[in-house]
Amino acid sequence: MDLAGLLLDEEGTFSLTGFQDFTFLPGHQKLSARIRRRLYYGWDWETDCTLEELSSPVADIAVELLQKAAPSPIRRLQKKYVAHVSREACISPCAMMLALVYIERLRHRNPDYLQHVSSSDLFLISMMVASKYLYDEGEEEEVFNDEWGAAGGVAVPTLNALERGFLSAMDWRLYTDPREIFEVLSWLEGCVAEQQGRRRGWYTYTDLCVLLEQPAWQLVLGSLCQQLAKLSCLLAMAYVSSVALAVASMAVIHQSLGLSCSPPPGPPDLGLASRCLLEPCIPSPMPQCLPSPANASGCLEGNVVLRSLWGSLLVSLTPPPLPPPDPPAPPILLHNCPLCQKLQKDSPTCRACHHLNHTVPTGPPSPWSHSHGLAPPWPWSPMPPLLPQPQQCSLFSIMELARLKSFIFPG
């Protein structure tokens, strides 16, 4: 709010016709409402809540400021004295703010004057000069020196001497730019809001609005907002990182569980094959027709396979490839033995009948007769041999197989 806003009306013009009819200048009511609301003057226009004396918070600020400006212990300023003078001399808030401007000038231009004057005299003379500057002769607010002396308890000659000394220290420069008045008003509003908020322990909405307009508070709140924004960003990054870590952990655990549930690579179960190989051949009646040479040699080869089975289990799982098989042997003439019903060659009389503890194999030696260096009959071997089909076995072969089983599995 500037001086032009106070002098111009709502249409932006100011007419001199009928000037005496104006009770208030344009914008004066807004300024009065601002002072009443922010300087704790009250809102009751009809009772004692007027602008003709200082409010209690403003009086406290004035006492504190003048005691610091004039540290002389003689006639030290008290709040009771400020309230009495402001009530008797009708000190307005604008006169109070103008007096504060004068005291601030003295602090920079003539600090020696403030060291020799008491705080009570400084308050009285600064308020009197500010009132005379604002209210010209002939106005209703005009107060003469004798009235000021009676209000402050000072004789008129002493008051006149104090006035001359004050004007000399000010170098008779009493003009003040309206912007300085509003700067002092803003500073005074901030001091009152901060002091009253600390005294009560809480701040009103008006106090918060006043404090947010102060440059120092704006800087503090700005830095606080920056710190809160940084903290929010850090918390957001930490949250996103934790969520990503949790998702990655769940993926790894799921993958590991999937791999553990899958069957591991390895050799197949040989229980069924071993049981099939260890089972003895069940004798069956001899077919009427003559069997082929391959079927006849199957029963003889079963014993050799059973003996070489346990040795082949100890061989490495990855043996070298099998050598190429031998060429097939020429067919051999076989004869049926009438005594043991067993096929023999060369002679119709079976030598197994005379030698019960020996079994003579027929045909060429089987490649399974040697367990060392041969691949086990497993599906993943390079050239797995075909397992012989169970055929009819002789009585002697069955006896030898039972004897072998009792030797391997005693009891």
From Swiss-Prot:
A Pfam family assignment: Cyclin
Keyword presence, Mitochondrion: no
Subcellular location: Membrane
Listed GO MF terms: cyclin-dependent protein serine/threonine kinase regulator activity; protein kinase binding
InterPro entries xref list: Cyclin_PHO80-like
Main localization (coarse): membrane
Gene Ontology CC, one term: membrane
Gene3D superfamilies: Cyclin-like
Coiled-coil residues: none
Membrane topology label: Single-pass membrane protein
Domain of life: Eukaryota
Keyword annotations of the record: Membrane, Transmembrane, Transmembrane helix
Chain ranges passing through the membrane: 231-253
Family stated for the protein in its record: Belongs to the CNPPD1 family.
Listed name of the protein: Protein CNPPD1
Source organism of the structure: Bos taurus (Bovine)
Gene, per the UniProt record: CNPPD1
